[in-house]
Amino acid sequence: MKTVVLLLCLLGSAQSLPRQLSPALGAPATKPTPGQVTPLTQQQPNQVFPSISLIPLTQLLTLGSDLPLFNPATMPHGTQTLPFTLGPLNGQQQLQPQMLPIIVAQLGAQGALLSSEELPLASQIFTGLLIHPLFPGAIQPSGQTGAKPDVQNGALPTRQAGASPANQATTPGHTTPAVTDDDDYEMSTPAGLQRATHTTEGTTMDPPNRTK
């Protein structure tokens, strides 16, 4: 857009100023005789502005030349370049990513939208920016990171890593020890192994001698 305005300014100034100046005093030259013909395609040495047909448009209209002024290091993240043809010019059109609007709402006591006349003096104004979750920089809420809220509060015991929340709420003082019966142990013993039995037959223990 800036280059188009610059081109129009150059055209207006070229038409308003005189085309030829006197080489000696700088005064406008006299009118040529009717028999004298000046070629239009040949540029005169004392001509202030050359003919517009001799100026290459590729030097004036350079689309995208003002983009490095805003971001000289690199192109903006998320921009897309689409080639297009404008007459003899070949440029690139810059498309900005879709920007989501900023919502500003004024809420009353009951949470309803109120006008400026009905608002109290100490009104609350909530401002939020909608960010698409696929955009870079989007932050997920803490409840959606994969961990449960009740698990994030405290560490789990050793044997309760996969237990239900009802079991996680029990304190160490209320836990009951595991009781194994002899019948269950005998059923769980493999066939090739023998269980060690505690026998007290034939073993006597003498009390220590007491000195009187």
Curated annotation (Swiss-Prot):
Region Disordered, residue ranges: 23-42, 141-212
Listed GO CC annotations: basement membrane; cell-cell junction; extracellular matrix; extracellular region
Signal peptide: 1-16
InterPro entries in alphabetical order: Amelotin (IPR031501)
Transmembrane segments: none
Tissue: Highest expression in the mandible. Found in the basal lamina of maturation stage ameloblasts of incisors and unerupted molars. Also found in the internal basal lamina of junctional epithelium in molars.
Main location: secreted
Annotated Polar residues bias: 33-42, 165-178
Location relative to the cell: Secreted
Post-translational modifications reported in the UniProt record: O-glycosylated.
Keywords for this protein: Biomineralization, Cell adhesion, Glycoprotein, Secreted, Signal
Protein's GO biological process: biomineral tissue development; cell adhesion; odontogenesis of dentin-containing tooth; positive regulation of biomineral tissue development; positive regulation of enamel mineralization
Tree of life domain: Eukaryota
Function: Is a promoter of calcium phosphate mineralization, playing a critical role in the formation of the compact, mineralized, aprismatic enamel surface layer during the maturation stage of amelogenesis.
Family: Belongs to the amelotin family.
Protein name according to UniProt: Amelotin
Organism name: Rattus norvegicus (Rat)
Gene of this entry: Amtn
